[in-house]
Amino acid sequence: MHENTFDCFIAHAGIFDEEALYYTTEEMWFADWDNGGLGRGYLSGSPWSEYPEAVRHYAHDPKLNVEKWNTPILCFHGGMDFRIPYTQGMAAFNCAQMMGVPSKLVVFPQENHWILQPQNALYWHRTYFDWLERWMK
């Protein structure tokens, strides 16, 4: 997909399935605005929207390109993230594993969209830099 452009990926609260996210996020304004609705009102950025921006947005959904994945990926997620549920990171990790792509999933059960507890933030940063050190050429 990226034709060896990147040595590795790191996704914090990453989105794997845009359509599923549309139905599961706690903040619908973001779902409509970010998905191509551009302030036209609720449902304007929905998966069934006919606005060209929304159609283009969903055409680039990561889940549609799993068969092209070959870059190692580290996925971080907060277990209490209601903006982007942790199952998005789990889905990306599971697909990477099924594709034989080196991958790691780190879920902080007591954290939300941000990793705020000091011990967790320290672990996040250590894991982040360890991943880069491992895969950067």
Model-derived regions, located:
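Active-site-proximal cap/loop segments of hydrolase catalytic domains
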Residues: 1-137
